[in-house]
Regions:
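Polar, enzyme-active/binding microenvironments
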Residues: 1-137
Length: 137
């Protein structure tokens, strides 16, 4: 899942499964801020910055909010949720991308910037107008 850099957003994770049988969905856990740990772009794990518990949705799936501090670093964002006394660990991977990249992919008026400046390591010159040939510099 892609996340927009430096943007507060709700994420989903799960299913939370019972630690004893590994099958039964845990639907009534109180997953606190300290139970949810993040690693930003390969950094050390630390509890998520956004306060608040996770909320159960259905079938062991939970949601929580990440704030702008949680999503301020581009790259892979790993989420680990674990309560050793109650559930098996959950691991989720998110990809934090710059705002312009996210908007180009998912905004209602999404348009990729396709301006070409180099081809085969050659700088493109010329304006592309009628009768103008593009030349490698």
């Amino acid at each position: 899942m892609f996340l927009r850099q430096s943007t507060s957003q709700v994420i989903r994770f799960g299913p939370a499964l019972d630690k004893d049988d590994g099958v039964t969905e845990e639907t009534s856990l109180t997953l606190a801020q300290g139970d949810m740990r993040l690693s930003k772009d390969g950094g050390a794990f630390a509890q998520k910055n956004a306060s608040g518990n996770a909320t159960h949705d259905s079938d062991g799936w939970y949601s929580t909010t990440l704030n702008t501090t949680d999503t301020d670093t581009c790259g892979i964002l790993k989420l680990n949720v674990h309560q050793p006394a109650n559930m098996l660990p959950i691991w989720e991977t998110f990809y934090v991308v710059e705002e312009t990249v996210y908007d180009a992919m998912f905004a209602a008026s999404a348009k990729m910037d396709v301006n070409v400046k180099n081809i085969n390591d050659q700088v493109i010159t010329g304006d592309g107008g009628s009768g103008t040939e593009f030349q490698g510099a």
